[in-house]
Amino acid sequence: MPRYLPQSIAILRQGYDRRQFVGDLMAGVTVGVIALPLAMAFGIASIPEGVAKAAGVSPPAMGLYTAVVAGFLVSALGGSRVQIGGPTGAFIVIVYGIAQQYGYAGLATATLMAGFILLLLGICRFGAVIKFIPYPVVTGFTSGIAVIIFSSQIKDFLGLEMGAVPADFVDKWKAYFQHLGSWNLPTAAVGLGGLATIVLLRRFEPRIPGAIVAVVASSCIVYLLKLDVQTIGTRFGGIPSRLPVPSLPPVSLELARELLPAAFTIAMLAAIESLLSAVVADGMIGGRHKADCELVAQGFANIGAVFFGGIPATGAIALTTANVKSGGKTPVAGMIHAVTLLLFMAVLSPLASAIPLATLAAVLMMVAWNMSEIDHFRSILRAPRSDAGVLLMTFGLTVFTDLTVAVGVGIVAAALLFMKQMADVSNISTITREFADDDALAELKDPNAINRRDVPAGVEVYEIAGPFFFGVADRIKDVLHRLERPPKVFILRMRKVSVIDASGIHALEEFHQKCQRDGTRLLLSGVHAQPLVAFTRCGFTDVIGSQNMFGNLDDALNEARAQLGLPSERAPASAVPEVARDRAGR
């Protein structure tokens, strides 16, 4: 079945040569080095210390097990050519809460159920449906998770002498202030030094992985100066040198029903982040992932991680991006990344005991900053009030209540607002391409029909009819990928788009970026008042340029002709204004 055929097999069928392997080898090793401190940090942040001791497990080792097993399975079975799987920051909040309340058995149960839910989502072809989750909801809970991750690292970053960190956000900060006097100067200095190293290398030498440099440098300093700083060895006793023998996890059937909402949240987070990562990768390599195949791979990856004592996994956007930038072209790079981590465990695991926890806290603080999406957050706040409200509600619920509640309430609220807006607007249709033989637009009674105009070769004209909401945003991407070759000029008619939301604007921004990569000039025609105001408030007008937006199709076609070096043509005498501001020019 082509829909579920892994990209790894498809690549091998097409032919895999030495040049591709060399690129994948370099990328895989590079990503493995970058993933090393992240995997350990995610494991430490996800499992409470008391739970780890009671279950006899090592949190940093659990992170590495997940990166190796899930990372290999995602690449081997996935629907994306360059996706890198493993533990991510998005899971820290939900995993920590489950482990703290239900113990390791509860976490294994929830992760296993989440794996089967992901398999079911993929088999039932829910890959396209998950893309309809509105952008403000995703940004809201992602930014909320970032705040929680940052706040959870204060204890290790400053070396505070306190017991278990409270799970509640407010209680957590109360505890920090109560124990602020116990901060440890060497620990804080190591944490600040690690954070500064990561930030400065990212700013001035982004090709060098700042996290691994910070980890190596701080480990050497702490060891040589014999500083009183907690390390992986002092708290967890080191890391095993090999993977454990796969075994049936301590699944609790009694807890299964109670943990079903948490398992569903893990599955939804894994699905959303993995498909977002795949979309980002598509934009970088010009490909197209198989969403349903990717969900099936994520399901097997989470099931496999549980059998090796791991934690939930998904596609990692940062590592996937690093893979592409390092030259990765095929799933082989992801499998090499997993093997690289396995070799580290076999050869260098004794040295991992010297890694300071303050440095890993600094690594996670940078992860939190990257997850915060502050620019997108601000942009949505300037979007229509309904989108801003959904964003703030999802963000607030994530930080102050529970991630499971936040995702559910955010999706329901966005759906209700969407249905209300759709009910208020008539004449809604889908994205359509105008051709001379299109019955709906070739009627003689339509004076602005495309068949009345001469469209030059090298110019494509598409039209969006109806409100451009999150439910329609993904369709424009599908239309783009059906084009055999990029045109010189792409005209997008928006005369029938009366309303656009933040997800629609985000889709247009990605569309514009793709056009720029393809050497295509994007022109918008017939932009109404509400979309124009939304463009201006969100900054899209500055991105595309006001010179590329026109009140009617005829002006846009003449601009396209000028781009192609062709003479302009007069508009048909029967043409009528398409938008209100165009009436003065007719």
Annotate each PLM feature.
Residues 84, 524, 549:
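Conserved SAM-binding loop
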Residues 370-543, 561-567, 585-586:
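The feature marks cytosolic C-terminal regulatory regions of anion transporters and related permeases
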Residues 543-559:
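Short acidic-hydrophobic, aromatic-tinged amphipathic segments that line or gate anion-handling sites
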Residues 1-439, 472, 519:
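Transmembrane helical cores of multi-pass ion-transport proteins
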Residues 1, 560-586:
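Intrinsically disordered or compositionally simple regulatory linkers and C-terminal tails
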Residues 95, 173-176, 476-480, 556, ...:
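Generic hydrophobic alpha-helical segments
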Residues 339, 531-532, 551:
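Short secondary-structure capping/turn micro-motifs that flank functional sites
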